[in-house]
UniProtKB/Swiss-Prot annotation:
EC number: 2.1.1.228
GO biological process, one term: tRNA N1-guanine methylation
Name the record gives this protein: tRNA (guanine-N(1)-)-methyltransferase
Protein family membership: Belongs to the RNA methyltransferase TrmD family.
Record's keyword annotation contains DNA repair: no
Subunit structure of this chain's protein: Homodimer.
UniProt GO MF annotations: tRNA (guanine(37)-N1)-methyltransferase activity
Statement: the UniProt record of this protein carries the keyword Transferase: yes
Subcellular location, principal: cytoplasm
One Gene Ontology CC term in the entry: cytosol
């Protein structure tokens, strides 16, 4: 069964973006996943097609209206079982574990926020899961939605040519990925580590693991501490 993605946005022309190319694009052509785009503005009821209003209590910016967004969400039907994500800088950080969980399902509904934010009432009433792709603010949820979809699609069964290739990537197993090398053997005075051309697969795997541990300890001590606590736990 194809993975069904549904994206609610004020800028549907931003999709599929880069997902129309390479692995994701070919997977879409093969019918391994589909993308349904919903223009939120189509669910406004006034002649100006208004989707936002000033924040209650005052303040800068505009807020996406609960009634308009709710109608857009409900257009998929009452019994749509797919998780509903709201791209938001205040959301829980997206993790590889959550990506795997989403990829194991039938699909996902992603709401792309705009303006200052989304009326809290629709977040609660429609069970939106707020998700962040990093500690920074974007002009809208569309780039973040593309990131989420990219992470999901590439691990769908059969999308990558070698399903084992994803097992050694960063965050699989909790560690960052080890360094990579390819021919030529020597480049600008720098050699490929001899262990990688030794033919000793056990030693190669040991080296790769040690390098993954080293990089994780140096660059992401938060991840390293988590892995260590789980290992000792």
């Amino acid at each position: 069964m194809a993975f069904r993605a549904r994206v609610l946005t004020l800028y549907p022309e931003m999709f599929p973006g880069h997902l129309g190319f390479s692995l994701a694009g070919k997977a879409m052509e093969r019918g391994q996943w589909s993308l349904d785009l919903v223009q939120i503005r189509d669910f406004a009821t006034d002649r100006h097609r208004t989707v936002d209003d000033t924040p209650a209590g005052g303040g800068a910016g505009m807020v996406l209206k609960a009634d308009v967004l709710a109608r857009a969400i409900d257009s998929a039907g009452e019994n749509d079982p797919r998780p509903r994500l709201l791209m938001s800088p205040r959301g829980r950080p997206l993790t590889q574990q959550r990506v795997r969980e989403l990829a194991a399902g039938d699909g996902v509904v992603i709401v792309c926020g705009r303006f200052e934010g989304v009326d809290q009432r629709v977040i609660e009433a429609r069970g939106l899961e707020e998700v962040s792709v990093g500690d920074y603010v974007l002009s809208g949820g569309e780039p973040a939605a593309l990131i989420v979809l990219d992470a999901i699609i590439r691990i769908l069964p059969g999308v990558m040519g070698n399903d084992l290739s994803g097992l050694h990537e960063s965050f699989e197993g909790g560690l960052l990925e080890h360094p990579h090398y390819t021919r030529p053997q020597e480049w600008e005075g720098r050699e490929i580590p001899s262990i990688l051309t030794s033919g000793n697969h056990g030693a190669i795997e040991k080296w790769r693991h040690e390098e993954a541990v080293r990089l994780t300890r140096e660059r992401r001590p938060d991840l390293f501490e988590k892995v260590e606590s789980e290992k000792n736990g």
